[in-house]
């Protein structure tokens, strides 16, 4: 209906997040490639302007469509264009405060802006009975609009009483509508409100869009849809089918069990701790299942708070809980946490409140892609005074970190962990860092979190030294001192380099007189979608790539580049092109950046990048007792 009534891309269709855009992609030239969606080198599951001229605005984080659409509409008005701009937003995304900021601003304009509210839960307003549905159909039809316009014009010609009569009719009509459903919130903001209407009735939708195009002010069309319409399993369990794996059986609706995960381990451990501590509360932002808090919500409903898509509110709300004497545990995805930085500074860190921030989906997340990878949290969280940051590489470290935070002092604790499960179960007692000391005492490989495990495995195979951090702020001083005497240190980070852990650690080492060489492997740009294993390999963060980097056999370009859609998949070996990125205070230090080997990804139009985590324990090779003693 949208594509029949609007002329895309001249008229701009702005979809909020990406879950609504699949049909849009099928209708705009990507039908033949649709089986590649969310796969390595295939179509993105979200809107990507570089993928199609019909994808106007990047999508991924919710609640942005109205503000973006209003900006485009205002730009059109300045340029004298008559194009239409349409924002399509779901009722879930409308819980985000940014949506209402956009609505509040848009209602004051006379722009050609149309907002389509896709309500698949009836959570905005419920109509009651047949009459309101009948009224909605009538007032959404072009003939109604034509008649309404003619009557208003005719009344306007009547001297003295014409305009007052028009206003009386409007008030009566508004009063009748309010008897049946609450649409005044949008009309009070200045929108012409239409609906609710059946979102599965194409003819009615086309009528609504035609009417909205004739409005002299912004219009909001409220449509009601059934999530998963046409697929019985999805209709019965819509929450379970919000996102499914490629291993789903379409005939039964069953998915392959994902196994034990960091999220599940976090949720289980938090329930255990909450049983013994009545002060513990859990807060999330519309991600109860994703963050592993479903069981907590059932066991402790009075201490569980899902605040909707409102990360800023979640953090300030948690600070209020902390002021009241509770221990709030806030579980958010890394990519969405970016929205709450001011709250972290102003409402939490500045007051030194005890809040435990559990950052899920830290690092590469796989098929969700560019806007969902958690590549920035270490960089911005490291700037917060007094914060303690952990990045566990396995479940045992996660459980230990969570227990330490619950029993810790008043301050912000951050525990960040990746999507999915652990690669290798813990063999040693969790601690702040883990070290392997090989025969080669001149070379050290360093990382943290998930990639820290890869570093340790690579170090064992190469018989060099490896250091994996669990506690990344403040950096353990004995681990720092251990790094000082190496001739060469290779740093690997599953996140942005600037402001990241590896850069912070290297800076501290240089201040302490480090005289060796340093090579940093970290992304410089955004990362495309694809399998986690492939992306980590492309970013030179898997075990084999770490081995190749240290030995100089093969190195991957890690700066990240936008790749044309006709480029073929595969990593090509090429010449080494290390670039000096600066000298430390000690002039003998030679700090290099690993920046070699281009990577082509078939049909990918986004960039490659990555972020890392790690932890450390002591496993001694021959003659390693001295190093162990030094660390202890």
Language-model segments: which ranges?
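Cofactor-binding active-site loop characterized by glycine-rich and histidine/acidic residues
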Residues: 1-109, 279-280, 284-285, 293-294, ...
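Non-catalytic terminal/interface segments that mediate subunit docking, oligomerization
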Residues: 6-7, 11-14, 225-337, 343-353, ...
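A glycine-rich helix N-cap at a beta->alpha junction
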Residues: 33-43, 108-122, 143, 349-361
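Long, well-ordered, tryptophan-enriched scaffold segments
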Residues: 121-266
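Structural signature of the thiamine diphosphate
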Residues: 165-233, 354-359, 378-428, 488, ...
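Peripheral docking tails and interdomain loops at the edges
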Residues: 247-249, 254-258, 366-368, 387-388, ...
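Generic long, charged, amphipathic alpha-helical segments
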Residues: 306-307, 460, 464-483
